[in-house]
């Protein structure tokens, strides 16, 4: 009946009975998640959620109140779609992590890779593989991103053929971007996609090695965007090849800062978790590298000043400056008028002084503290209080 009498049973006996009756399911965790670089995790504003949108089941859900991603690995169908659309690389494919993929790609040097889903029905295919074509079986047909594709292309030095009837949106956009890049550089397509047997035969007959495209790099411990940037920088090779349009799923952009209103509070730097915006302590400036920017817009939302930082999303510029840090804003440090220690930027001090000075109603001590470091502020105020007490005592 599903009812059990537990009267007279000890706690251990009850627990053992529940364990015996509870169903047990075995499942694999196909996705690895790094919350430290996730662009949804604990953000004040929702700026990303592509993985949830890409998931065909309820394996990934958003917890809007805490801005946490909730994973149900038992509901995962192992398609890998979430991995291909993750902009920062916070999601990685556990079956073939990026580092493992790079090592496997090295084995394809001098070969033309034919990517085939492990679940594909190959028995009914009547296809003869040309010389130098080597199949690459993948269990998740939609995990391939632009980083995976460029890694395989450069390590092999040849075009890549994908045989997949229902290619994922993230992988489709990645193929489009990589093809644009190769057409500008080599005047050749990089990836040939075949969705049926006839197209597969055609793609295999066309696939070839691309002279001057083979390149190997160590990807260990590098984030997703930086891997792609390093490989792309080598391909550009100091030339100006033009621009590549990007999509909503794979976004790039450039950040601009109005130096007249920027106080170098570094809120934008703290908001950027992919290190596209960095504070340069040597020059006391904010520098920006567009090749790793995901165009999330969180820097705009985090800026304390009005009309100061602007994001211009849309394209990848195939030129040397796209891969280097450029200065967006700079200011000199302000020295404490008491001890001479530099403690803040000049613009920040001047802005606070302009706001607070009218509120201090000519109080010389308080006005002085606006230009002092934290240590000297206290000293100035204590001295002012002691002087006031001394004056009151002397005046009776």
Where are the predicted features?
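Ferredoxin-type iron-sulfur electron-transfer modules and their immediate structural context
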Residues: 1-54, 58, 111-126, 183, ...
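Iron-sulfur-cluster electron-transfer modules
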Residues: 35, 63-162, 168-180, 326-396
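Basic, glycine-/proline-tolerant helical and adjacent loop/strand elements
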Residues: 50, 56-81, 87-88, 92-108, ...
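Short, well-structured alpha-helical interface segments that form or flank functional binding sites
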Residues: 143-147, 263, 267, 298
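C-terminal, active-site-flanking charged/polar segments
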Residues: 145, 157-161, 167-188, 291-302, ...
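Short beta-alpha junction loops
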Residues: 164-169, 194-198
């Amino acid at each position: 009946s599903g009812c059990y009498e537990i009267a007279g049973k000890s706690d251990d006996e009850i627990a053992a009975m529940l364990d015996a009756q509870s169903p047990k399911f075995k499942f694999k965790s196909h996705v690895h998640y790094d919350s430290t670089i996730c662009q949804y995790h604990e953000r004040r504003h929702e700026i990303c959620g592509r993985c949830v949108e890409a998931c065909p089941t309820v394996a990934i859900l958003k917890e809007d109140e805490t801005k946490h991603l909730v994973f149900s690995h038992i509901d995962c169908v192992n398609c890998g779609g979430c991995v291909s659309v993750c902009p920062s690389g916070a999601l990685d494919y556990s079956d073939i992590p990026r580092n493992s993929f790079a090592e496997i790609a090295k084995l394809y040097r001098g070969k033309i890779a034919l990517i085939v889903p492990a679940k594909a029905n190959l028995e009914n295919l009547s296809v003869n593989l040309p010389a130098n074509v080597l199949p690459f079986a993948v269990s998740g047909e939609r995990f391939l991103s632009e980083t995976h594709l460029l890694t395989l292309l450069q390590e092999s030095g040849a075009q890549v053929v994908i045989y997949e009837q229902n290619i994922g949106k993230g992988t489709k956009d990645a193929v489009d971007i990589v093809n644009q890049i190769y057409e500008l550089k080599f005047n050749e397509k990089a990836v040939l996609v075949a969705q049926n047997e006839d197209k597969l035969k055609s793609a295999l007959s066309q696939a070839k090695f691309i002279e001057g495209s083979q390149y190997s790099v160590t990807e260990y411990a590098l984030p997703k965007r930086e891997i792609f940037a390093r490989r792309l920088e080598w391909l550009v090779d100091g030339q100006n090849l033009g621009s590549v349009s990007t999509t909503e799923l794979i976004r790039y952009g450039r950040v601009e800062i109005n130096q007249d209103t920027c106080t170098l509070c570094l809120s934008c730097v703290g908001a950027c978790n992919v290190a596209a915006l960095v504070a340069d302590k040597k020059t006391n400036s904010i520098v920006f590298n567009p090749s790793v920017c995901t165009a999330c817009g969180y820097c705009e939302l985090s800026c304390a000043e009005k009309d100061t930082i602007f994001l211009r999303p849309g394209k990848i510029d195939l030129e040397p400056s796209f891969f280097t840090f450029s200065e967006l804003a700079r200011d000199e440090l302000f020295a404490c008028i008491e001890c001479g220690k530099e403690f803040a930027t000049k613009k920040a001090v001047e802005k606070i002084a302009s706001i607070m000075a009218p509120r201090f109603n000519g109080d010389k001590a308080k006005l002085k503290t606006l230009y002092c470091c934290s240590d000297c502020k206290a000293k100035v105020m204590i001295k002012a209080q002691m002087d006031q007490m001394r004056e009151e005592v002397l005046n009776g």
